[in-house]
């Protein structure tokens, strides 16, 4: 009896760390529960706002150990949509995204900082227009739990800003328009 109890306790103690381990999620783009939107100052007067309609990715997350989080995203840059066909054609061209040569942009996390209360800084490498540079995303864990269809979901928001010139974007729109602001909404479905 003591041997059985000891064996059971050892078995439970070996399984306990696995229960607290990170879960893998796929970003839910099919259900339109994720978005990548951008904003660029337009000549100091207003903003051009747009989005990327085609992207995919995954992440690994454990709320008990958020610093172990990993994120990988691929964006089809041809899917840029600023709600203006002629402008989108220009954005896809050599002055901006050069999609004829670089049809994909990627982000791969390298580390995560836990700032408390669900706030994170996700550090990683953004590859855009054939150039790879470090990028930090200020993120917030919105929540996680069971969905009505028997799955499990986790959601995050994020923001970041980068200088267009850092990624070899040739078009100079002036100092007021030199940076791109990204707003991210991510909902993942546990695999």
UniProtKB/Swiss-Prot annotation:
Subcellular location as annotated: Periplasm
Gene3D superfamilies recorded? Lipid/polyisoprenoid-binding, YceI-like
| Pfam families given in the database record | YceI
Concerning SMART domains, the annotation shows: YceI
Establish whether keyword Signal is in the entry: yes
Any one of the GO CC terms: periplasmic space
Please list the disulfide bridges.
Answer: none
Q: Which UniProt keywords apply?
A: Periplasm, Signal
State the InterPro entries in the record: Lipid/polyisoprenoid-bd_YceI, TTHA0802/YceI-like_sf, UPF0312/YceI
Instruction: Tell me the first and last residues of the signal peptide.
Output: 1-22
| Superkingdom, taxonomy of origin | Bacteria
Q: Which family does it belong to?
A: Belongs to the UPF0312 family. Type 1 subfamily.
Write the protein's name.
UPF0312 protein Sputcn32_2702
Write down the species: Shewanella putrefaciens (strain CN-32 / ATCC BAA-453)
């Amino acid at each position: 009896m003591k041997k059985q109890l000891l064996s059971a306790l050892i078995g439970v103690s070996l399984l306990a760390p696995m229960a607290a381990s990170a879960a893998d999620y796929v970003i839910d783009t099919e259900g339109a529960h994720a978005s990548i939107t951008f904003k660029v100052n337009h000549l100091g007067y207003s903003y051009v706002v747009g989005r990327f309609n085609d992207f995919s990715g995954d992440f690994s997350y454990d709320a008990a150990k958020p610093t172990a989080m990993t994120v990988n995203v691929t964006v089809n840059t041809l899917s840029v949509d600023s709600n203006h066909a002629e402008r989108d054609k220009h954005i896809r061209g050599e002055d901006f995204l050069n999609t004829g040569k670089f049809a994909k942009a990627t982000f791969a996390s390298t580390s995560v900082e836990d700032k408390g209360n669900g706030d994170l800084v996700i550090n990683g490498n953004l590859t855009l227009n054939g150039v790879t540079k470090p990028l930090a995303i200020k993120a917030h864990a919105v929540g996680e739990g069971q969905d009505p269809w028997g799955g499990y979901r986790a959601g995050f928001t994020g923001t970041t800003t980068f200088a267009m010139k850092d990624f070899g974007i040739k078009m100079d729109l002036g100092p007021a328009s030199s940076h791109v602001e990204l707003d991210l909404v991510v909902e993942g479905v546990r695999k």
